[in-house]
From Swiss-Prot:
This is Mitochondrial 15S rRNA processing factor CCM1. GO terms for biological process: mitochondria-nucleus signaling pathway; mRNA processing; RNA splicing. Residues 1-76 form a transit peptide. GO terms for cellular component: mitochondrion. Regulates mitochondrial small subunit maturation by controlling 15S rRNA 5'-end processing. Localizes to the 5' precursor of the 15S rRNA in a position that is subsequently occupied by mS47 in the mature yeast mtSSU. Uses structure and sequence-specific RNA recognition, binding to a single-stranded region of the precursor and specifically recognizing bases -6 to -1. The exchange of Ccm1 for mS47 is coupled to the irreversible removal of precursor rRNA that is accompanied by conformational changes of the mitoribosomal proteins uS5m and mS26.
Amino acid sequence: MYMARCGPKNNVLCFPFQLSFLFSKRLINKRFKYTLQTEDEKDMMGSLSKNKIITPEDVEFKLAQLREFSNTLKERIHNTKSVNSDGHQSNSIAPISEDSRNVNVTKISSVPNEEKSKNLSDLIHSSFLEKMDHLVPKVIRERVADDDILAKNLFDRSHSNWAPVIDRLYVSEKRFMDIDSREFSVWLNGTVKYLPFHSILHLDEMLLEQINGDVVKFNTHMYECIFNNLGNLKPTNFNQDGTNDKVILKMKELLERYDKALKITEERINKKEGFPSKVPKMTQAILNNCLKYSTKCSSFHDMDYFITKFRDDYGITPNKQNLTTVIQFYSRKEMTKQAWNTFDTMKFLSTKHFPDICTYNTMLRICEKERNFPKALDLFQEIQDHNIKPTTNTYIMMARVLASSSSNAVVSEGKSDSLRLLGWKYLHELEDKNLYRHKKDDLNLFLAMMVLAAFDGDIELSRALYYLFIAKKYKTLCANWKGNILVDQDTIWKSTLMPEMLNYLMLAYARFDPRNLPVLSGYEKGIELRRKFLREFDSSMRLDDTDKLVKFKLPFLPISDLNSEAQVLAESNAIWSFNLENGGTRNTLTSSNEAALEDIKKYRQLLDSFAQEAEDFNEFKFKVMYEVTKMQRESINVNVFNKISLHTYLSIPINLKQQKEFLRRLTFFTFQQHEFEAVIKRLYEGYRNIPSSHTRDQNSISTEAISVSKPETTEDLNLIMHDIWYITCLRHKIMMDTTLYELVMKAAIEFQNEDLAKKVWNDRGKFRTTVPFLKMDQRIRIAKDQKFAHLMVEFFTKQGKYSDAIAIILSSKNRFNWTYSMVRNLHKALEEIEDRNSVEILLDVVNKKSHAKALKWEEQELNM
């Protein structure tokens, strides 16, 4: 351990206490890390012969040494400061004033030191000067005139923040004036990054001022710096489509400036005023930043504008990086056909444009969405044939593609288990290769294993993976938490719980089948891997009971093997509620009668004020919807409560054939748009028609009038109370959409519940008249209608009502594209009863050869 003497000395430059302690802390950390590393290496060498393991107690002992040393050093620096201020003026130099902060201190620090070793202040000062020389030019440091800002925001390069530095330069007197623009701009482009939009505007203004507004002198490095910072920005939530986006407009303004510079240069050449020494040029990096931000906005129009602009005006065609960005955009927008076309173009354009591993990983992600495992296998073979080195994410994506493809018997060609087995083989290969893993790869790896285990219905492994990942993340957050862990449990759990992990755990519950054996139990390597996770899960559950530092519990049943449907339903409900209530830190889903009455009273007054303040019904509706959203964010973990996870959660009782539990979950966690609008309208009209209590006190109303209207008023108030409770419960509900209506129809098919089928048919018909449905793209609306019609045909087929099923097909034959796969079950049923006439009509619709008999059938139905 290194120690430093900190007593008062001659010729010592004194820094402010906070700055001195900051630098000393960094220096000590550096030295301590080196000491630990040296000692650890010695311990490791010794452990080869002694089999000695470094225990947590040893690490804690070293950390205690560091804390004690830091406290001692802090006290000595404080004592030195006190001694200097009390009377040792002859042995010290006064603290640096604001005016003299940026004096050339190199001369001062170069005073001959007669002692052999420098004191701590000398080391701090020399380290500060050396690091500053690498961070900012000397002239910039002088104009910032605040070493504290530079040290605080720039010393940690992994978290450097240039915004305060740029803003400080913006308010300085000289800014960038009288600085060599070429040398300065080279440094600027490679250093200043991740500025907010207002700081980018300040930087652009100062650069223009530096060249006296001559846009011809605005060189390539300046353009690249500005575009790089613009490309790293994120669009605002209310402007995701890029319409009139301020960043897009700024990019176009810069391109107009460049066009103006080219025009001025051409005019100067024609007038023989001299050719500029260096004309700025547009680059591939600038194009990529334009495309990167356009894809964040999901703006196809802007992306096409930039590609066309650079190609036609500047002769710059998209390179490999640009095309990869375009493919990623297509992937996010579900434009898979365009993505495949662009990918094929890259392969056959030239060797410079040939896809790299990043592009292949993007295409594998598209294969996962399409459940196209044959194409994914072809892509992986291409990677090997072209000697492209796969990354960790490549193997993870292959496992995910095979897992998602195995979920459908038709897609998997009846080989679901084989696909999942192959997916595990890719993960084994990843483990054997020991490739570099980014910290995000651990999450992706856990998710890949969760996907494979979930689609396999392996509840035991899914529980273990979920528990181990959430426990690791929770304890890591607690270990690094700067606040009070007990007080901040709500925030910690919100950062810990993940919607993807919850969704795959719910999927494992939904695919529960005690008769099936996991695919991992079929070979030795799989058995070892599965036992490893189950063993860690079991030991973690036991050890956490004695962990007094960080208490961590998940509401799993205290049994290692779930073997009944009741257990699956109970545990899935517990885990679901635990996630929605943010790790048990909120009490939203279970409330007492007293609490419910308090909520009704509170929101009755609030809704009353909304109704009185609103100018019309639309304003009242907006206020209520805003309040519901606010209420939901305050009481529910909205990160995990989404339509995808809810869909999976509702599918559990369907697959387990538990109709009562399904209806309970559906009613408790969903609401319908038309019902919501009816309740809002009743409340608005009720508040408008019934005078407030204050108004009734002022008006003279006879006792007889009150008694006559009392029964009606009581009934109306009961209805209002019911409607207010409906609004209050929306905090844990999600609006029904086309996907959820399809799920309810699947439940009606599974349970053979005709009443449920009729209800969902009518409810969806009302939903089709609401704004959310009408706002959907027409092609999507038709596709959703066709999917629901197909489910209705399946329901009537299973009910044996073949005439009703055929009637649905005939009534929609001109609107929907009926294929044989959609009517296969109906066709088989008609063949079994030997209804040749209906079979012929059905096949005519599917094959679209002739609609004559179909029309005849319609005529017969109408006559009947």
